[in-house]
Amino acid sequence: MSGRNMELHRNGTAPEAMKVIGINGSARKDGNTTIIVGKVFDELNKEGIETELIQLADYEIQPCRGCFACKGRGNCVFTNDGFAEIFNRMVMADGIILGSPVYSADVSAKMKAFLERGGVVVATNPGLLRHKVGAAVAAVRRGGGMTTVDTMNHFMLNKEMIVVGSTYWNMVYGKNIGDVLSDDEGMANMRNLGENMAWLIKRLKD
C-alpha cells in the first residue's frame, strides 16, 4: 500500500477501508458499460478505494410487486431472486456507480426493475442510502443518453445520496463492444468522474 493511502486521519487513527460497488445493467457482461465503469474504477483504485462490479446479467431481477411488505424490514421480503443480495451490498458500500446501456431511450429493463425495487425499499425505510456517494454512467450509440443518466440520477437524488459530476454528461459513445474506447472525450470524462468520486469519498471519511 502506498504512503499516500497509509495517511492517518486528523485524530491520528488509521482510515477506514473504503469501497465502491458498480452495478452494470447491461445484458452484455463484457460490453461497453463494463468498460466505462472499469475506467471509473481505475481512478478509485489509484486512491486506495476497493471496487466491486456486480453484473445484473448474472441475476434474475423481478419487478416490484407494490406490496410494501418491505416497510420497517430494511430490504425486500422476496428473496427468490438477486435483488436482496445486491441491495445489501449497496447499503454496506461507501459509493455506488449505476451503469446502463441505452435501451429504447432509457435504462435496461433489469436496471429499471432494480431501481423500482430499491426505490420502494428506501422509501419505506428512509435513510438506508443517505450520504452515500453515487454516480451514473451510460453507454450510448446515438440518442437517449441523457434520459438514461437522468433515470439513474433521479433514483440516487431521491434517496438522499450525494451525486458526483464530471466535466460533461456521463455518457460514452459506441455500438460494438470496445467502440467506447475510441471516444476520447467520453473516456476522459470517466477518468475525471473517478477522480471526483474518490476525492469526495475520502473527504466524507476524514
Task: Describe each model-derived feature in a short phrase.
Residues R4, N11-I21, K46-E47, T79, ...:
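Glycine-rich phosphate/pyrophosphate-binding loop and the adjoining helix
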